[in-house]
Regions:
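Non-ligating segments of multi-cofactor redox enzymes
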Residues: 1-412
Length: 412
């Protein structure tokens, strides 16, 4: 195993493959405070890519209800348990540094399969059968499902809670599926970092299914090969006719009704770190505002999917899922500064990928306090630009308010 630097855990770690990095990296941000669990993203993906025989259980995009839901069932809890068995009580953060074992480091210590390069497991058929299991099931007193606290709650954290977690392949910087494949059938595209399967080389050993910590590599029994999310790469290449040759967001992003999704491409330096691109919305949300956090960064794959954590969920649960930056992310989101509030308006305003934004300052609307902190709202205008530098759209922080005229009072 070689040594690679993983900025999400703030240290070098062991990885079975040689280190290589793409020129740009596909990345996305999901705002979990907005998700309504409508599954429109899920069906947009399903109707585009996985509607054929043998793909019945394939949901490349899924939306599960946390803390009890999961697809496949218990995918995260089972891996967390495996890691704790290998490294009892050692899976801890010290500030921004993860001092426990990643799935690659734990595989070396695991006393099970000596040939295992990545710690993981194969889900059972039963665990794949119910993508919406425990949908809308809240946490009640003492963790009992579907019950409610009779004595009320104290905000901002709720005693009775659940939230929707939308998931696709994270197109990781250090993919577990790629590291585990004995056929070298999995690779990252050099132009955008999308993780793909060469189906001519795949022999269906399912090592990738076992190794992916997020369980987004899926075996198709009719063809006996692995299939997975391809990040709608023809759209990234600008081949969708509706995009006029410009890179477009994926089907699941474009269909999002709750406006929770923003997708982009970030420039990557030779050492694997993100190149500074101050006015790329991805770079701003992840590296500057730091409101968007990776999903289970302690697994060690450096996922390129980022989440704005739900503000009503107990902090310890969120820290286990998104790492030590949760408190700062939620505080920044609840009392956003002028630039962050403007950038948040760009979610789902267009299907084209935003490569750069510009803010034109507008008038002050009002001042108030949020949780004891001063907040000022400005009606700024934010302008989004595509890869060619052309303007995609411009929108304002304060959305227009329309009053229905009397002659249309009863119309729908």
């Amino acid at each position: 195993m070689g040594q690679v630097y993983n900025w999400q855990i703030n240290r070098k770690m062991e990885y079975p493959n040689e280190e290589h990095h793409p020129q740009s990296q596909f990345a996305f941000v999901f705002n979990l405070n907005r998700c309504i669990g409508c599954q429109t993203c899920t069906m947009a993906c399903k109707s585009t890519w996985t509607f054929s025989k043998g793909q019945e259980y394939m949901w490349w995009n899924n939306v599960e209800t946390k803390p009890y839901g999961g697809y496949p069932q218990h995918w995260d809890v089972k891996l967390l348990q495996l890691l704790n068995q290998v490294n009892p009580n050692g899976q801890k953060w010290n500030g921004a540094t993860f001092e426990g074992m990643t799935i690659f480091e734990a595989a070396k210590k695991n006393i099970g399969d000596a040939s295992q390069r990545v710690l993981g497991y194969l889900p059972t058929d039963e665990e794949w059968r119910a993508p919406n299991i425990y949908e809308d099931s809240p946490v009640g007193p003492e963790g009992v499902k579907n019950t409610f606290h009779k004595d009320g709650v104290t905000l901002p954290e709720h005693k009775t809670w659940f939230f929707y977690l939308a998931r696709i392949c994270n197109h990781c910087t250090y993919p577990g599926c790629l590291a585990a494949c004995p056929r070298n059938a999995i690779y990252k595209r050099p132009e955008d970092g999308v993780v793909l399967v060469d189906q001519q080389r795949c022999r269906g050993y399912r090592k990738c299914v076992e190794a992916c910590p997020y369980k987004k590599a899926m075996y198709r029994p009719t063809t006996r090969v692995t299939e997975k999310c391809i990040a709608c790469y023809p759209r990234l290449e600008g081949k969708d006719p509706s995009g006029n040759g410009q890179p477009m967001e994926t089907r699941c992003m474009s269909a999002c009704i709750g406006q929770i999704r923003l997708q982009g491409l970030v420039k990557i330096k030779d050492d694997g770190n993100w190149a500074e691109d101050r006015y790329n919305p991805m770079y701003y949300l992840v590296k500057v505002a730091k409101v968007a956090l990776p999903l289970y960064p302690q697994f060690g794959t450096e996922p390129n999917g980022y989440y704005i954590p739900p503000r009503w969920v107990p902090r310890q649960f969120l820290k286990q899922m998104f790492g030590p930056g949760v408190d700062q992310a939620i505080e920044s989101y609840m009392v956003p500064d002028r630039e962050l509030l403007a950038v948040l308006q760009m979610f789902r305003r267009s299907n084209q990928i935003i490569f750069r934004y510009e803010i034109q300052e507008g008038p002050k609307v009002f001042e108030t306090q949020i949780h004891g902190k001063p907040f000022t709202l400005y009606n700024d205008t934010i302008i989004a630009y595509n890869k060619a530098g052309g303007e995609i759209f411009r929108t304002q922080v304060e959305e227009p308010f329309y009053v229905r005229p009397d002659k249309h009072q009863n119309s729908i």
